[in-house]
Regions:
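Hydrophobic alpha-helical segments
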Residues: 2-263
Length: 263
């Protein structure tokens, strides 16, 4: 595998990074609900908030995938064009799930209206992509703007459901690592995936494109360090967290490190 990866172009390596990001975000998030809330240490409202945020993060991840597929399609990649409609359909379902969760758990009216507004943005963007009214860079920019908006809704959920104000340091740090920092890292990696897909489809990587990818690489390194720092803080005074998180965190660090070293 290594020899194959070494033969890949810079753009292809960044696409692999983006795919890796979608796998790795699951590890802290999956452990999060089980670890943070065992023994009913947290208020029920916080548990509900974590469930809502999990659904929002799912929409963000699907949006990141759709951004990459769209960039490839608009750049002329027929294979990615064939995969895109299924991802668009999954995204529509994801928006539905969040809508239901917000209603079910009585989220703040402002959060509900923000979500409805962003769903309209998504519908308009998807139609423009499907009819190929956009160039790949513009599609990537609009997807990224929408994803930024979804992050802000997630931040509102953190505050509204009391997840931002946990008095326990260990669960607060785990909340930040699993529900915020890991998603920031996947977003930087997802942006690289979209750019990589675009350059691959175009069959060229101009100097300014290489500079953009290298700048993105620096952001990934910083975001990865940020995530690991918060995981270490969560582990510091909690043996249960340490037992369950240290191994996966180390494996994640090594995997990302190896992939970055190839670029």
């Amino acid at each position: 595998t290594m020899s194959l990866l070494h033969r890949l172009s810079l753009a292809q390596k960044f696409m692999i990074l983006g795919l890796l990001a979608l796998v790795m975000v699951a590890f802290p998030a999956a452990l999060y609900l089980r670890l943070a809330f065992q023994g009913a240490a947290q208020a029920e409202r916080q548990v509900e908030g974590a469930q809502v945020l999990g659904e929002i993060n799912g929409v963000i991840q699907s949006s990141q995938k759709h951004r990459g597929l769209s960039a490839g399609m608009l750049g002329g990649n027929v294979q990615l064009e064939q995969k895109r409609p299924a991802m668009a359909s999954a995204l529509a379902q994801g928006y539905d799930k969040v809508e239901r969760a917000l209603a079910s758990f009585h989220a703040a009216p402002q959060t509900v209206s923000q979500w409805a507004e962003h769903r309209k943005e998504w519908t308009a963007l998807e139609q423009r992509v499907a009819s190929k009214q956009l160039q790949a860079p513009e599609s990537t920019r609009l997807h990224t703007e929408l994803i930024d908006h979804l992050f802000l809704v997630g931040e509102g959920v953190l505050d509204g459901f009391g997840l931002s104000f946990d008095p326990r340091v260990d669960t607060h740090m785990l909340t930040q690592a699993a529900l915020v920092k890991s998603m920031v890292l996947t977003e930087h990696m997802g942006q690289m995936r979209a750019r990589g897909a675009m350059y691959l489809a175009q069959g060229t990587l101009p100097p300014e494109g290489r500079a953009t990818l290298q700048a993105g690489l620096r952001q990934i390194v910083l975001a990865q360090a940020d995530l690991q720092r918060y995981l270490a803080k969560a582990n510091a005074d909690n043996a249960a967290f340490r037992k369950d998180l240290e191994g996966p965190a180390r494996a994640l660090d090594e995997q990302v490190g190896k992939t970055l070293a190839m670029t």
